From Swiss-Prot:
The gene is rplC. The keyword Ribonucleoprotein applies. NCBIfam families: L3_bact. One of the primary rRNA binding proteins, it binds directly near the 3'-end of the 23S rRNA, where it nucleates assembly of the 50S subunit. Keywords: Methylation, Ribonucleoprotein, Ribosomal protein, RNA-binding, rRNA-binding. PANTHER family: 50S RIBOSOMAL PROTEIN L3, LARGE RIBOSOMAL SUBUNIT PROTEIN UL3C. Methylated by PrmB. GO terms for cellular component: cytosolic large ribosomal subunit. One of its GO terms (biological process) is translation. Pfam families: Ribosomal_L3. It comes from the Bacteria. HAMAP family: Ribosomal_uL3_B. Belongs to the universal ribosomal protein uL3 family. This is Large ribosomal subunit protein uL3.
Length: 211
């Protein structure tokens, strides 16, 4: 089963093993994922389960969204997420919690990276700076040439240049689940995960560990 869960990044801390080894971990709160729709090949052309988390005021929900949540008999959430499903059955209103994962399991975590605004090539692409002296003036952090002359007469697509940095979908693969706290609905994942504290993250079984 490749289904995952939607959680909220709480921040980072560290825990110690019995041998005294310090392990940096990210704490992810797994609020109950309420199933809003179960899609099948007969009705939708593919198998998937759609979930929502959290709560949203009725004044912040459109009529279409309110009808969708009411049909599933679940409270309106702050969004909907979908997971493709190879096997298993779910019903609208079911709840998916942190017990889906076990300690030692490898997971992929997806989130939105922190926005950095408009960034230059040194910060955005790790370009080296130009000479500080030796005749260089006002060009210490500029990227330099961005192409050739009349042939080809254009800048190639994908050229690394200054621009907006961050605030994009990022996935970190094969992180180890160090601990599962079912009582408090917490996952402790080894290492860092994308995004700022309080941001939504999607935790799935690692694609490279599915065999």
């Amino acid at each position: 089963m490749t289904i995952g869960v939607v959680g909220r990044k709480c921040g980072m801390t560290r825990i110690f093993t019995e041998e005294g080894v310090s392990i940096p971990v990210t704490v992810i709160e797994i609020e109950p994922n309420r199933v809003t729709q179960f899609k099948t090949e007969e009705t939708d052309g593919y198998r998937a389960v759609q979930v929502t988390v959290g709560e949203r005021r009725a004044s912040r929900v459109t009529a279409a969204q309110a009808g969708h949540f009411a049909k599933a008999n679940v409270a309106a959430g702050r969004g909907v997420w979908e997971f493709r499903l190879e096997e298993g059955e779910f019903q609208a209103g079911d709840s998916i919690k942190a017990e889906l994962f076990t300690a030692g399991q490898l997971v992929d975590v997806t989130g939105q990276s922190k926005g950095k605004g408009f960034a230059g090539t040194i910060k955005r692409w790790n370009f080296r700076g130009q000479d500080n002296t030796h005749g260089n003036s006002v060009s210490h952090r500029v990227p330099g040439s961005i192409g050739q002359c009349q042939t080809p007469g254009r800048v190639f697509k994908g050229k690394k240049m200054s621009g907006h940095m961050g605030a994009e979908r990022v996935t970190v693969q094969s992180l180890e689940v160090v601990r599962v706290d079912a009582e408090r609905n917490l996952l402790l994942v080894k290492g860092a995960v994308p995004g700022a504290t309080g941001g939504d993250v999607v935790v799935r079984p690692a694609v490279k560990a599915r065999g």
